[in-house]
């Protein structure tokens, strides 16, 4: 720029020839580097044409001979990639993105992984590394799941997967005890469901498969063939495949019959025990009745013996006949004066003078029957029974010389050793 300014100053001079020479020389200097730029463009264009042609010698520079496989320059592993044209790359704002399929130790394993992913994306008509007939079994399995689930299963089989994670789906090594644990995600709104720990990866993978079929149906992604779990699922009451209504009803009837038979087999011994238990009570009741009858007979015999003993005592020693005394000072019923309540009446000054006192005057000239009823009014309602028997009265005729119809018996006890109570009974003879 400084040179151009100097040239402009020089052009102001009256000589016009000098200015014309400077203007003609500047474009010549600026056009000198242009051929170099053209050479760079020519070098880049043929290299781009060669990259599109797989048969060109430039293709020999690729890290792998298989389609979709490249070798990592640092790790040395072979990585499988897939270009998904149908997806939209939001980062670069363009259509299509690269899908990572995992890193493998062998080049052939990475090539097989690419073929499986290509079959899932574009079908059997796409270009593969190996013939499509080698993937007949995998074609059936991949049709049950989505693209994302199948790609995740392919990545798990790669050797470059995170350490501690098994090659089987839903299986990982426990960080404490080193055993293999199984988990399944997105069950009942939870992040994952813990299925337990196992000694081998295969056992944990089978546990995951069972849970996946139970919660996600027959179309769930499993580590092994679903036919290996049909018997186990039936025992749990899980039927992964659709069943006809007729066959389903027959199966229900068969299961119901089996349940009834098992219940009957369990209830038969119980019924026998119940019958034995029911047969035993009548024998016990008969024995109890016999014992009661024997007790009653023994009580009756005891009562009869007690009555005989009482009668013998009364007839022999306990009967005391109260005869009338010739003394006018005593009455025939003076046994009543034995009570302490009548002791004041027995002490009289006339007794010292030997003057007889007529005691009936003390009772206001009342008859004997009225007085005796008044005295024994409280005890007249008590009945004598065999249990409370203290005294038994034996009536006998009064002697002809006595004018009073009363005969009284008194005893202190039914036996000389058992009781000490006093009881009185009177018998009127008309």
From Swiss-Prot:
Pfam families: AP2 (PF00847). It is found in: Nucleus. The keyword Repeat applies. Residues 65-131, 167-225 bind DNA. Keywords: Activator, DNA-binding, Ethylene signaling pathway, Nucleus, Phosphoprotein, Repeat, Transcription, Transcription regulation, Ubl conjugation. GO terms for molecular function: DNA binding; DNA-binding transcription factor activity; kinase binding. Its main location: nucleus. Residues 53-63 have a biased composition (Polar residues). SMART domains: AP2. Residues 1-66, 260-297, 398-422 are annotated as: Disordered. GO terms for biological process: ethylene-activated signaling pathway; lipid biosynthetic process; lipid metabolic process; positive regulation of cutin biosynthetic process; regulation of carbohydrate metabolic process; regulation of glycolytic process; response to sucrose; triglyceride biosynthetic process. Ubiquitinated. Residues 260-274 have a biased composition (Basic and acidic residues). Interacts with KIN10 and KIN11. May be involved in the regulation of gene expression by stress factors and by components of stress signal transduction pathways. Transcriptional activator involved in the activation of a subset of sugar-responsive genes and the control of carbon flow from sucrose import to oil accumulation in developing seeds. Binds to the GCC-box pathogenesis-related promoter element. Promotes sugar uptake and seed oil accumulation by glycolysis. Required for embryo development, seed germination and, indirectly, for seedling establishment. Negative regulator of the ABA-mediated germination inhibition. This is Ethylene-responsive transcription factor WRI1. It comes from Arabidopsis thaliana. The gene is WRI1.
């Amino acid at each position: 720029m400084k040179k151009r300014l100097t040239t402009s100053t020089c052009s102001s001079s009256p000589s016009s020839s000098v200015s014309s020479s400077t203007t003609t020389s500047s474009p010549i200097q600026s056009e000198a580097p242009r051929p170099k730029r053209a050479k760079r463009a020519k070098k880049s264009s043929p290299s781009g044409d060669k990259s599109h042609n797989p048969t060109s010698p430039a293709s020999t520079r690729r890290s792998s001979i298989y389609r979709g496989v490249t070798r990592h320059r640092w790790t040395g592993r072979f990585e499988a990639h897939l270009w998904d044209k149908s997806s939209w790359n939001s980062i670069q704002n363009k259509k299509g993105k690269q899908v990572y399929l995992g890193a493998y130790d062998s080049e052939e394993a990475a090539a097989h992984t690419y073929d499986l992913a290509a079959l899932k994306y574009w079908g059997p008509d796409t270009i593969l590394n190996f013939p499509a007939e080698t993937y007949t079994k995998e074609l059936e399995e991949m049709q049950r799941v989505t693209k994302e689930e199948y790609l995740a299963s392919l990545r798990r089989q790669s050797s470059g997967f995170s350490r501690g994670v098994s090659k089987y789906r839903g299986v990982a090594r426990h960080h404490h005890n080193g055993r293999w644990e199984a988990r399944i995600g997105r069950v009942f709104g939870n992040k994952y469901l813990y299925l337990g720990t196992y000694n081998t990866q295969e056992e944990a993978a089978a546990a995951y498969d069972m849970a996946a079929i139970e919660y996600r149906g027959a179309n769930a992604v499993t580590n092994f063939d679903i036919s290996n779990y049909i018997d186990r699922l039936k025992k749990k009451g899980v039927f992964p495949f659709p069943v006809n209504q007729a066959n389903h009803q027959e199966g229900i009837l068969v299961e119901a019959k089996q349940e009834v038979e098992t219940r009957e087999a369990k209830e038969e011994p119980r019924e026998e025990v119940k019958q034995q238990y029911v047969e035993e009570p009548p024998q016990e009741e008969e024995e109890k009745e016999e014992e009661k009858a024997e007790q009653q007979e023994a009580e009756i015999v005891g009562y009869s013996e007690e009555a005989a003993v009482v009668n013998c005592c009364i007839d022999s020693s306990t009967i005391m006949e109260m005869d009338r005394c010739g003394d006018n000072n005593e009455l025939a019923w003076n046994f009543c004066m034995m009570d302490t309540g009548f002791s004041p009446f027995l002490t009289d000054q006339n007794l010292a003078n030997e003057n007889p006192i007529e005691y009936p005057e003390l009772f206001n000239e009342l008859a004997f029957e009225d007085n005796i009823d008044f005295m024994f009014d409280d005890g007249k309602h008590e009945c004598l029974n065999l249990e409370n028997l203290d005294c038994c009265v034996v009536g006998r005729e009064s002697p002809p010389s006595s004018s009073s119809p009363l005969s009284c018996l008194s005893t202190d006890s039914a036996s000389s050793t058992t009781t000490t109570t006093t009881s009185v009974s009177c018998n009127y003879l008309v």
